[in-house]
Amino acid sequence: MKFKHLSVTAAVLCALGAALPSFAADAKAEAKVVVIRAGKLVDVVAGTVLKDQTIVITGERITSVGPSASAKVPAGAQMIDLSSQTVLPGLIDMHTHLTSDAYLGGYNALGVSDTRAALYGVRSARKTLEAGFTSVRNVGAGGFGDVALRDAINEGDFIGPRMSTAGYAIGIQGGHCDENLLPADKNVVGRGVADGPWEARAKVREMAKYGADVIKICASGGVLSKGNEPGAQQYTLEEMQAIVGEAHKLGRKVAAHAHGASSIRDAILAGVDSVEHSSLIDEEGIKLAREKGTYLVMDIYNDDFILQEGEKAGMLPESIAKEKVIGQLQRDNFRKAFTGGAKMAFGSDSGVYPHGDNAKQFAYMIKYGMTSMQAIQAATINAADLLGWKDRVGSISVGKFADIIAVKGDPAENAAELTKVSFVMKGGEVIRR
């Protein structure tokens, strides 16, 4: 019966295949054409700002970009006048937790089911997209809530950014990625816990099985977890090599949460694709990152929120105390890493602070060493490269998705203008105007 079913299915598919050319032709003929007149356009590839540009969009993708004076506008196209604004590619945040709520820190989180958290994600996704972030990498969520959210957005059920998802973050028992808030008699162990190289390999396979696009690991302790020091290494080099080897074999990149110098060094030596936080990175770590081409994703805005709102948000007293020690060091080391030649991608750790405020980080990236253009590039072409999506997003280029935003000011002069996004388009559809 199985083979009979397959043969019938094959026959149906063949019949459909014969009709596909006409379907494709009809779809192409009916694709909506939109034309954007841009007063200024940020060319993130060249690092320049172009004046009086016209962008032609057919369906989801960009089909033409060039000077307005010579642009050919298709008959019947929908016109969008942004001639008084600056247009740039949709932004990308490489470190989000869309299913987390900033005001449910510490023990408050124990009252939230994974299902409820996934519903927070629906709200957070919309806020993030409306803020101009058209793609995100979500690096940890319970119950594979981020995977479900990604799929729902892709299927058109909800509005949100393009998502690369990790599922559960993987770490050692008792470490930053474990569940450490409950006492011993409850015997609660986090779903992402894996000790030793072979357990770690198996956990990578599990994450991939259930839909993770990227593998997130905890190489060191953390600020917001109970009972561990941010600078203390947790995974060994051997364990991280096993994780990276398995993940890369399965076509997944690896992001390593690492605050301490030794954990950063071993994560880079193990071959991770990015190091998150990098708070206590030293000269050796910067040199290794530069030589290996490892991206650093440093969240240097949320220190403000933790110190100002952490107690109100329910964060543990020990977490606030740790942040007081590590926050400014991370910002200073951001400058050292950037000037030392390490590749940087924008990542803000949204969910630690309220979603939609992602762009507040730009001001700190500029304060600690970047030009506005370099900060924008970190959130566009650099982030797209780290995602493995350079062919899809990250610049306003022919063939890429029409993920486009606009602001009334000039973000290339002051990237902090990106906190005031006035226009958002994702895949040719206007989300905010």
Model-predicted segments: where are they?
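Divalent metal-dependent hydrolysis catalytic cores, especially in the metallo-beta-lactamase
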Residues: Y120-D146, G160-A169, A212-S225, K253, ...
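His/Asp/Glu-enriched, well-ordered alpha-helical/loop segment
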Residues: G111, K249, E318, K324-P411
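Histidine/acidic-residue-rich catalytic or RNA/ligand-binding cores of hydrolases
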Residues: A102-G105, S225-G227, I264-A270, I300-M315, ...
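Bacterial N-terminal signal peptides
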Residues: S7-P21
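Active-site gating loops and adjacent loop-to-helix segments of metal-dependent hydrolytic enzymes
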Residues: S100-A117, R126, Q173-V188, V223-L237, ...
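Histidine/acidic residue-rich metal-binding segments in metalloenzymes
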Residues: A148, E199-A219, V223-Y295, V325-M344
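Metal-associated gating/positioning segment near the N- to mid-region
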Residues: Q85-D157, Q173-H176, N180-P183, E238, ...
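Histidine-rich, glycine-flanked metal-binding segment
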Residues: D26-E30, L41, A46-L88
